């Protein structure tokens, strides 16, 4: 049974996991995450230098813990995997160097994994994962994309955000409302007691150069500006800020936009399954709305398990195992890290010489 040790350090979560493929089913044998959220909360966002230092401190202990829980020595692994792109370069380097060092020391293949490919693989950790082809709504702190996953696991991006990702918009609006970082969970909690229909907010669209709009693309900068102006107007009128109603109205319009464009894209592509992955996919309103409207339109909706929506190493291991069993030999030990790299060029992460 193929078994991998996987590492994730692309942003503000240090993570390690042990995964095994047993009769075609992925098994998470052990998984550990050390979150840095509380450390970064005082600055209202991730500080790259602090993130890198905290990864250096946490990762060795996490690796030791998952190895002990799995009861597995390094000699019994088939590969080591680590996120190498995209993300904070310094943070990525911690996981990459650790992974490559372990692979070299124990003569194991190393798999440099694209972080977004990991998110796409997270749905395979569900008890009943969907079978491709399907449309993925990848919605996280740094990315909002619509990706078609084909029967042979090929990936084609059909839509994207042209400015802020949905998760970034949640964080920025959270700060505007005086909420703690990260904004997503804080807005969800506050919105639970609010009136989502009280304020009318714009659904940003992206214009085409020749006229019309990109049907599957997203823009959240206008929504963010509308929220700023609304808060300023209410404050200048000396009104008590209706934070719960503001949070609920914002959360509702984000969910509306994500659901409407995802289902439009799925229908246009003739796809009967939509998959949601990424940190924002944990949002309760989004999950409920996508499920309800998908059912109304005859589209099956799958979501990655909640514990694997936010950054974790299990999803990196899932992506690595998928590569391993498909016959990929691994990445060069000379592969570095990159803050940005397109998802449609993941194949070159396994080329020699490496792309970076």
From Swiss-Prot:
Domain of life: Bacteria
UniProt KW Transferase keyword: yes
CDD domains for this protein: ASKHA_NBD_TsaD_bac
UniProt EC number: 2.3.1.234
Enzyme class: transferase
Transmembrane spans: none
Binding site for Fe cation: 115, 119, 311
Binding-site residues, substrate: 138-142, 171, 184, 283
GO terms under biological process: tRNA threonylcarbamoyladenosine modification
Cofactor: Fe(2+)
UniProtKB keywords: Acyltransferase, Cytoplasm, Iron, Metal-binding, Transferase, tRNA processing
A UniProt-annotated Pfam family: TsaD
Gene Ontology cellular-component terms listed: cytoplasm
Function: Required for the formation of a threonylcarbamoyl group on adenosine at position 37 (t(6)A37) in tRNAs that read codons beginning with adenine. Is involved in the transfer of the threonylcarbamoyl moiety of threonylcarbamoyl-AMP (TC-AMP) to the N6 group of A37, together with TsaE and TsaB. TsaD likely plays a direct catalytic role in this reaction.
Family: Belongs to the KAE1 / TsaD family.
Protein's name according to its UniProt entry: tRNA N6-adenosine threonylcarbamoyltransferase
Protein species of origin: Prochlorococcus marinus (strain MIT 9313)
């Amino acid at each position: 049974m193929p078994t991998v040790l996987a590492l994730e350090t692309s942003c503000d979560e240090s993570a390690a996991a042990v995964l095994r493929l047993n009769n075609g089913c992925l098994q998470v044998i052990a998984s550990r995450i050390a979150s840095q959220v509380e450390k970064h909360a005082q600055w209202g966002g991730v500080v790259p230098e602090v993130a890198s230092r905290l990864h250096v401190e946490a990762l060795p202990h996490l690796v030791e813990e998952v190895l002990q829980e799995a009861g597995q020595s390094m000699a019994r692994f088939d590969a080591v995997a680590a996120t190498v792109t995209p993300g904070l370069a310094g943070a990525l380097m911690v996981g990459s160097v650790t992974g490559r060092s372990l692979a070299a020391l124990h003569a194991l293949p190393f798999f440099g994994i694209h972080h977004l490919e990991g998110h796409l693989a997270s749905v395979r950790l569900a008890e009943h994962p969907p079978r491709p082809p399907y449309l993925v709504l990848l919605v996280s702190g740094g990315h909002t994309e619509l990706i078609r996953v084909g029967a042979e696991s090929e990936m084609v991006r059909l839509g994207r955000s042209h400015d802020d990702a949905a998760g970034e918009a949640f964080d920025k609006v959270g700060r505007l409302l005086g909420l703690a970082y990260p904004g997503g969970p804080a807005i969800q909690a506050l919105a639970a007691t609010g009136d989502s229909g009280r304020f009318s907010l714009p659904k940003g669209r992206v214009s085409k150069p020749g006229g019309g709009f990109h049907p599957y693309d997203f823009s959240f900068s206008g929504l963010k500006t509308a929220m700023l102006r609304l808060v300023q107007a209410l404050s200048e009128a000396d009104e008590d800020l209706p934070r719960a109603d503001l949070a609920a109205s914002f959360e509702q319009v984000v969910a509306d936009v994500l659901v409407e464009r995802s289902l439009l894209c799925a229908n246009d592509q003739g796809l009967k399954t939509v998959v949601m992955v990424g940190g924002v996919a944990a949002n309760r309103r989004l999950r409920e709305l996508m499920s309800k409207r998908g059912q109304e339109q005859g589209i099956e909706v799958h979501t990655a398990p909640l514990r694997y929506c936010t950054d974790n190493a299990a999803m990196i291991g899932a992506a690595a195992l998928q590569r391993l069993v498909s016959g990929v030999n691994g990445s060069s030990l000379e592969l570095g890290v990159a803050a940005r790299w397109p998802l449609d060029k993941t194949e070159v992460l396994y080329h020699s010489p490496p792309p970076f």
